[in-house]
């Protein structure tokens, strides 16, 4: 996989603010998440009720990657329905991504994503087809934590500067 480019860009601002390029948002999305950026994964329970979980995603090769225990609510939801949203507050932007999530067990991807997590401060290591570390989020449960790719098909970004603006980009799945 490689970085993806939008197949459609639409200015959805209702106040006449100018368009802004995908690159501005993409560069912020690809930066290490860290603690100063809040990210939330939205899923749907099998009975239709919504679920939201704070997560620590990393950007790799044009997609986001997340981890989770197979026993966690978010992963159980994704196994039943892979559609999800990812909402992130970035410096200068509020961004919501819509897409699908799939489990990753490719050793090369696991190794590369674990290295990105280590660069971001979480000491993740590959253990079989999942990741492990001395610690994780308080609600993560015990290791191992499996890796999942969030492949987005739509991105909506609100620019938070004085000039404002709102854009929607669509991507091939």
Language-model-detected regions and their locations in the chain:
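Charged, gly/pro-rich active-site loop segments
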Residues: 1-21, 93-173
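Short, basic/aromatic recognition patches
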Residues: 12-39
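Short secondary-structure boundary/capping segments
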Residues: 30-31, 56, 76, 138-140
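Generic structural signal for secondary-structure transition and capping sites
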Residues: 37-38, 83, 122, 155
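A generic structural signal for alpha-helix starts
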Residues: 72-73, 108
